From Swiss-Prot:
Site (described: Important for catalytic activity): 19
Enzyme Commission code: 2.7.9.3
Cofactor binding, note field: Binds 1 Mg(2+) ion per monomer.
GO cellular component: a single term: cytoplasm
Protein residues bound to Mg(2+): 49, 89, 225
Protein name listed in UniProt: Selenide, water dikinase
Binding site for ATP: 19, 46-48, 66, 89, 137-139
SUPFAM superfamilies: PurM C-terminal domain-like (SSF56042), PurM N-terminal domain-like (SSF55326)
Entry similarity comment: Belongs to the selenophosphate synthase 1 family. Class I subfamily.
Active site annotation, chain numbering: 16
Cofactor(s), names only, from the UniProt record: Mg(2+)
NCBIfam families linked to this entry: PRK00943.1, selD
A GO BP entry: selenocysteine biosynthetic process
Length: 343
């Protein structure tokens, strides 16, 4: 029965596009203050991908959680994407995920438990690939289907990669193409070509593990993963946090083939426009529809990384030899004008 259920029709928004928008989130967490625990390395004070808590001289915990709604119709694939998406925050910090707990919100009155079983199986498959132990979980009966994980990783505190430490002169690299939110909208509307859906699914089920290992080995100066706030939103967080400007060559930003045609067909999620409304004040050099894929909320998106130029070239060379996708899309400049400048 699971192959007959269209999960995307049962939710209002798909994947990371279902997250609270940046403006609402900023207002909600404005009064939350950082803990004064001396072992807390990274907390709630910034827009980091995960928290970091020291438990030894050379060891710290990386802690994160992520929950999404279905953005594909197949339950197993949805579970796998949700797990890859949750693991990604640990990878973005340079950590190694070691344990995870399932978080499932399930409409038991409208779906058979076989659907939940398939979702959990997909999540477990991604965890097995990552070498991460599933240690438990929690379920809630809910009107809308959601699934995600709480993930704990390990890291050497001296090797944490933050999102606020890019330096002028660094080169900017991305490790996956954009457009999964737009494609998910088309899947829900049944206006998607099978090959475009397959390509998006391939990217969303690809773990950021190998790219993260190489990022750390090549001495990344800063990194984040591109998710619900879109490429521009997360690039803004990096630039504002480091008090620099990101000069981006728009033509070099990779987009999944088929996305421009879907934009022409109106397959743009509300989250894309919400991101544009919030972040367009931080952008100069271009505007309008060409930027829509860059505002698009991504699910299980790639890593956005900065390196010193020689290290960037090493990363790109090694990525090519190891069969990893990577594109150099710009450079970091001293702050001046807007945080994001397109050329």
């Amino acid at each position: 029965m699971t192959d007959k259920v269209r999960l995307t029709t049962m939710v209002q928004a798909a994947g990371u596009a279902a997250k609270l928008g940046p403006a609402g989130l900023e207002e909600a967490i404005h009064d939350i203050t950082r803990s004064d625990d001396p072992n807390l390395i990274v907390g709630v004070e910034g827009a980091e991908d995960a928290g970091i808590y020291r438990i030894g001289e050379n060891l710290a915990l990386v802690e994160t959680t992520d929950i999404i709604t279905p953005l594909v119709d197949d339950p197993f694939t949805f579970g796998r994407i949700a797990a890859a998406n949750a693991l990604s925050d640990v990878y973005a910090m340079g950590g190694r995920p070691v344990t995870a707990m399932n978080l499932a919100f399930f409409p038991a009155c409208s779906l058979p438990t076989s659907v939940l079983a398939a979702i959990l199986a997909g999540g477990s498959a991604a965890l097995k690939e990552a070498g991460t132990c599933l240690v438990g979980g929690h379920t809630v009966e809910d009107d809308e289907l959601k699934f995600g994980l709480a993930v704990t990783g390990l890291i050497d505190p001296a090797r944490v990669v933050r999102n606020c430490t890019a330096r002028p002169g660094d080169l900017i690299v991305i490790t996956k193409p954009l457009g999964t939110g737009i494609i998910s909208t088309a899947i829900k509307a049944e206006m998607i070509e099978p090959e475009v859906e397959a390509e998006a699914t391939r990217w969303m089920t690809t773990l950021n593990a190998k790219a993260a290992d190489l990022m750390v080995a090549c001495r990344a100066t800063a990194a984040t993963d591109v998710t619900g706030f879109g490429f521009i939103g997360h690039a803004c967080e990096m630039a504002l946090g480091a008090k620099v400007s990101f000069k981006i060559e728009l033509a070099r930003v990779p987009v999944i083939p088929g996305v421009p045609a879907l934009i022409d067909d109106g397959m743009v999620p509300a989250g894309c426009y919400r991101n544009r409304q919030h972040y367009e004040q931080h952008v100069s050099g271009n505007s309008g529809d060409p930027l829509l894929p860059l505002f698009d909320p991504q699910t299980s998106g790639g890593l956005l990384i900065t390196f010193a130029p020689d290290d960037a070239r090493t990363f790109l060379s090694r990525a090519g030899k190891e069969g990893l996708f990577a594109a150099c899309i710009g450079e970091v400049e001293p702050a001046g004008g807007t945080p994001i400048v397109f050329v």
